[in-house]
Amino acid sequence: MKSSLFSRYTCFVLSILLTLVFLIMMRNHPWFWLPALACGGLMVLGIYDLTQQRHAICRNYPIIGRLRFFFEFIRPELRQYFLEQDNEEIPFSRTQRTLVYRRAKNEMGDKPFGTLLDVYQTGYECIGHSMRPVEAADPTSFRITIGGADCRQPYSASIFNISAMSFGALSANAIRALNLGAAKGNFYHDTGEGSISRYHRENNGDLVWELGSGYFGCRTTDGHFDPRRFAEQAQSPQVKMIEIKLSQGAKPGHGGILPAKKVDAEIAATRGVPEGVDCISPASHSAFTTPLEMMHFIQQLRELSGGKPVGFKLCIGHPWEFVAIVKAMLHTRILPDFIVVDGKEGGTGAAPLELSNYMGMPLREGLLFVHNTLVGCGLRDQIKVGASGKIISAFDIASVLVLGADWVNSARGFMFAVGCIQSQSCHTNHCPTGVATQDPLRQKALVVPNKAERVYHFHQNTVKALADMLAAAGVSRPEQLTSHHMLRRITPTEIKVYADIYYYLEPGALLQPEIKSEFYARMWRMATPTSFDQAISLPAA
């Protein structure tokens, strides 16, 4: 017992003894005041540890117990730089980050001595190559025209674009660099729900304005949608499309609040909210409450914007809710110009752990469900579909194209391009590279012209890599890639093509008297265009 007690207080006792020793020795050698001061400081810290009530470990282990907090503080850096395996995705592996960094710097991305991947591991994926490869197409031709029959200003989008990230979440310099890179590379920059800031406008890069439930940039004083203010911004030539945000993969079904102390004059002006007051983003929209009302809201936005493409972004949660939206399309004949499917693996900032880990459908399942539902209702050829969620490489792009996407967006990929090192401190305002902070000194470290070049090169080199992959597979255009080109290892001894793994509906299948798929038949019965709620109650299994 005495031995245990002494070991717990060893550092504290030694600090007292050494303080006394150095004080005595100061009588002969005055310079001993330095170690006396240091040991005295430790002694005072030990006394504080013994008397404080917040940390039990410090009360039991004064002074030395604080090493736990120090090691806990530096653990992420130690893990990332010394312990993490090259292919360990938490959330992005070193191999993935290095790929982005090299492409952003326009450096050679070739790697010698073969793959580091275990090609016999279950889940390994690849694209089948052709014995008759074709010449690689011009990557700049990989563009998609977005805009349906009711759209008067269709937009030609790149196959690879910057996903939604708001000013406020990202620094002013990060926004500048992203938009300047997008302008040079002729691809679009999604504003995120934080509205269009002056930094988005400086370099005139194409913008997709994301409209969240807070209606930032076009809201009334009580937080509702303001048609007049919306029209003023949406009709700007720089704004190419309007995207209604229903949910996002990082925290689906969750609203948000920006504390009053963070709502400075610049954020307030950008979002159209009072300065110094809590900025609330509700979990759901007030402009519509049913799928039918949502379709009419889409039509209203299209008219107010001057006929620009209008669509929505969502992470699939309850499947019947999306089916209800599609039924509302059929009922009203009002169609969105596009739909962006966000996977639950997405997320550029902080989110409640339970929501980021356990809410929402992963991208591939959500994307295929959206694609199948539109195909089954005969609407797929009238609505373009985008995808976002942990997409950074040409292979990532190809793997979602075969599941129904027409184009893709990337957020964290472009964050890496402007300097993000995955410190995972986005929510602390202490981002070490100036990407995700509003600290004026920290964001000064991000040099806009330099990082804009990296954004441009990352996009350019990634799309070029996609063109090379397609050519090796024997196709020249992204839309020619099918589920028969992509393979996945199912067991250590079996590989299947996507066409044999995933279920694809036939055109018009959901409009037939009898729906062959039991799952889609059940979702169809559960959905109604008049409500997001279930139309029927199913018996318990």
Locations of regions flagged by a protein language model:
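Conserved, well-structured core domains of diverse proteins
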Residues: M1-Y188, G194-N204, W209-A250, P259-A260, ...
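Internal alpha/beta core interface subdomains
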Residues: A172, R176, G185, H189, ...
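A structural motif
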Residues: N186-F187, V239, G307, P336, ...
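Phosphate/diphosphate-binding loops
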Residues: R219-L246, P362, L367, N372, ...
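Mobile "lid/hinge" segments at catalytic clefts and subdomain interfaces of large enzymes
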Residues: S236-R271, Q422-L441, H459, L466
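Glycine-rich phosphate/ribose-binding loops and adjacent secondary-structure elements
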Residues: I280-Q443
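Gly/Ser/Thr/Ala-enriched C-terminal appendages of enzymes
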Residues: I392-I397, L401-P507, L511-T528
